[in-house]
Each structure stands twice: as structure tokens, then as C-alpha cells.
């Protein structure tokens, strides 16, 4: 079996060339499929497909994010007392791609280190009164009471999330090019102004991903630019994005990002 990024890229290119919304996996030759892959069998049966006798529709899906909050190998960030572990973190252990099961090992190693550091930090810091916590919560709630209007219903949120998913999958998915990314960037600007405040953080993250993909004019690891199909040795670095006090997204390049511990 080829690595996931190669399989996903092949499927995405097939869908792009044919205009179909999936590729087809023929597993009918595998004996006792339901015993070897019970979860897949159950999922297929829920949509009326018998994988023992019928082809299975497949398409790439977002699975793992190689980037994330910049941390060191102990889960520490540049925010004092804030630790990040797992898929939300960028430790640098994966590079531009990820080998299968590496994320599990990363979580076990870094996750095993964080508790001792957190306890050590708590022992050297003072306590916060319950009154101070409740007061901060009330102030924050009052400051954002108009962020979620009465019309912000579960149906509306599902509709907004679906629109965002379709845009990101279609334009910023497995295969990318400048035209698709620029179109996505423009639409994300509009969505940020029109979607409910509840979606703002998600849209901001989508904007950062899109901007990062536009700036990286090469193909490297899990990032595939159809208009730049080869790696560029001059771009062997990472980009660190942040939200400035002016509300704008800023970025800087560095070879091996590490948090500025304080």
C-alpha cells in the first residue's frame, strides 16, 4: 500500500480530471472482507453498499494537520502556563509530512512529559481565588453577549460549516494551484464578514492555511501545488503565523521554529 499522501493525491487528481465526486475501490476479491474490516463493512452497509459484491466510493478527507501551535519537545508554548500536545501542536517531529502512527508516538512522548512540568509550574505559582475566576468569566461573557444572535441556530451553523468545508475541500484540498487558492482567499474574506461570530476562529484558521499554501510556491510533503510540482531547495523552512494587535495576520520564516519561553 502506498503512503497516504500519494494515495490521496492520486484519488484527488482522478476526481479533478473526471469531474466525479469520488473514485471507486474494488475489494470484491478479498475473502471474508466483513471479518477483516468490520468497521468499513458497517459504514458501507449504512449507505446500502455490500463491499463483498460492490465497489466502494472513496474520496480524500482531512485527517491530520502537520502544522499547529509552535511547541518544544515538552509541549511548552510561548504563552506561560499553556501546553499543547497532539494534533494541535507543531513539535517539528513530522516535517512536511507524517509517517503512519508517528502522531500516536508523539502524543505518548510529549503527553507523558507535560503533567510533570504542569505540576512543577503550579508549585512555583500562587493560587487564583474562585472569585477572580468567576469575575473574569462574567466579564468575558458580557463582552461577547452580542456575538451569537438569536438567529444563530444549529441549522444555520451546519449550513455555514458545510459551505466552509466545500470551499476548503474544493480550493485548498489535496491538490492546489494559485488560481484556486486566490479564489478561496477572496471568498474567505467575504465569509469572515458574513458568517456568524461563532465561525470567526474557524475562518481565521482557514485564512492562515490558504495564505500559507499560496506563499509556498513548491510541492513538499503533503503540500501539492500543481503549478509548482517540484520541491524548491530555497524554501526548506517553516512559516509561523500570528494574529497581530491590528487584527491582521502576520508571518515570519524560520528553519526550526521554537517557542520563546517566558
Where in this protein do the model-derived segments appear?
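FAD/FMN-dependent oxidoreductases across multiple families
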Residues: 38-83
